[in-house]
Every structure is written in C-alpha cells, then in structure tokens.
Amino acid sequence: MTRYVLIGAGAIGAPVAAQLHESATDVVLVARGAHARAIREHGLTYARPDGDRQVRVPVVESAAELELRTDDVLVVATKTQATEAVLQEWAWRPVTGASTAAETLPLISLQNGLENERAALRRFARVSGASVWMPSSYLRPGEVVAPGEPQVGTFWLGRYPGGLDPDTERWADDLRRANFVVRLVDDLPRWKAGKLLANLANAADALFPDDDRAGELNQALRAEARQVLAAAGLDPADPRDDPEVDLRAFGLAPALLDRYGGSSTRQSLSRASGDTEADFLNGEIVLLGRLHGVPTPLNSRIQAAVASVARDGVPPGGVGTALLDDLLCDAAQQGAPTG
C-alpha cells in the first residue's frame, strides 16, 4: 500500500496530508518545531468551507524518525529555499528491503518555481512535480486554512523533465479521491513556467496588499518575464486556457476569506519567518535574464525589496507607497504594459 511522506507542513503540505488522511490513504506529515508539537498534541486544526476540524494525521519532525519502505512516495511541499536541505536529509536515507531513498523512491515536488525538480534530479532517479493552484494559508502553529471549493485545489502533474512516471496515474487517483482536481501533463516545465508567471504577483501582494495599483505592477513584471522566458526557450502554459480544467468552477468560501492570508510570500512576512520564496520567483526571472542577456530591472528591484523587508521583519504593507510609485514609474519609462 502506498504511503505518502509529506515533507513540509505549510499551506500546501498540511492540507494535502489532511485530505489524504481523511480519504483513508496512508500518509505521514513531516513538520517542525511548534507546528509539529501542536499537530502531535492536538491534531491539525484544518479549516474548510464546511467548518473547522481536528485531523489526527501522523507527524514526525525528521527523516531519522521514520523507517522508509519501498512503497513510500516522498512529496516535497516546502518553500524552494528549503529544498537543498530537504534533499540532503532524505536522499541517502536507507529504505527497508532496498538501498536508499534516492535510488529507490519516487519524489514529487509540489513547489513553486523552476528549480526544485532539477535540484532533486541531481540525487533522485525518479522525479515528478506539479503546478499547484491551491489557495491556502499557514499563519500559526497547528492550523491551516484551505478555503477552495468545491475542490481543495488543482494539480497539473507530470514527470520531470517530461513524460509520465509509471505510477503517475495511481498517484492521481489517490489525490482525486482526496478531493483534488488532477490533470496529467507530459510537458511539466511549461506548466511550471506558467505558474511562475502567476507567482510573480506574490511580491507585490506582500509589499502592497491594500493598494489596487499592485495589479498594474504585476502586469509589468510579467511582461518583463515573458521576454526572459522566450529567450530561455520556455513556452509557458496558461491554465486558464486548459480545455480539461475549468478554473472558473473553482472558488473561495466567503466565510473563510478573513482567515486567508494571501500569497505565500505575504504569509512569510506575516509569520516574520526571515526569508521568502522571492529569490526563486522574481529571482528566477532575474537569473534567466542574466543567463540569456535580457534586462530585468523590475523583477530585480522587487526581489531585493522583498528580501530587505523579510530580513528586517517588516509586516505586509509596511513599506508604504513610495516604492510602488517608483516601480510604476520605472515600468512606464521602460515601456512595460501596466494597464
């Protein structure tokens, strides 16, 4: 029987683990610190449109606490900046009746950005990933909020760098039984690139959560990014144009909107975590721009701004409006579309 080991118990990993557990699928959640202690002692407080509940999902704090089996699937749901540490911890763990995790077990990345699957492939022989569309929040230890309805979220799931793992259909069936929409794709990098374009808005959501002009900045950031992705030979897939998945049928429960913490970057600032994914979102565009000779002044500047506020513990919206004024002025001067 397949057991899913969810590494990372934040806004993605915890809801996935809860849904799998409630659908009678074998799952273990890997959490840390106060979050792990709260889940172990009281269960995961899981807020859904039909109410809050305590989910007694099994939890461990490290690879050393778990005896890996040949039927395990490692599912990584940490922020990208934690990926290297995760791979170091788990790749060469022994697997009962086999050799090591990297040689034996499949790994699925449920993470943002373009770097995670590539990094995993350095150690793991079988790497898959998903472009994840799942509004959810982790703002306090032991609690996550998942307001999506009727399904919890949507996955575009495939093998990296292309094709499908022999077990992909079985994984998809387990996720569907757990109330997720799953679309199998054999061109995963296109879907990850499409999600990256959407995630470029995370920085503005964190810095300027209450300013309607942030939408104008996001258009300019994406216009800059599209030039970079084209130069890098990437053709982003737009999930809104997917004939097999109708995102218009997906909504957020009004009763949970006041508990939804916004983008993952805004949630990181709210928790004063000290770092964010911006280096692997806007920073990925900056990296590709430098590799392919495409200037990225807007993404570079907002990447640095997010890093500064995260370092200094500034909460969402704490930078004021002058920075947004400057960024919009820069966008206008370079001719980027903002409206």
Question: PLM features: what roles do these ranges have?
Answer:
Residues 2, 72, 105, 153-155:
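Nucleotide donor/acceptor-binding cores
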Residues 94-101, 144-159, 203-210, 262-270:
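Helix-loop-beta segment of a Rossmann-like dinucleotide-binding subdomain
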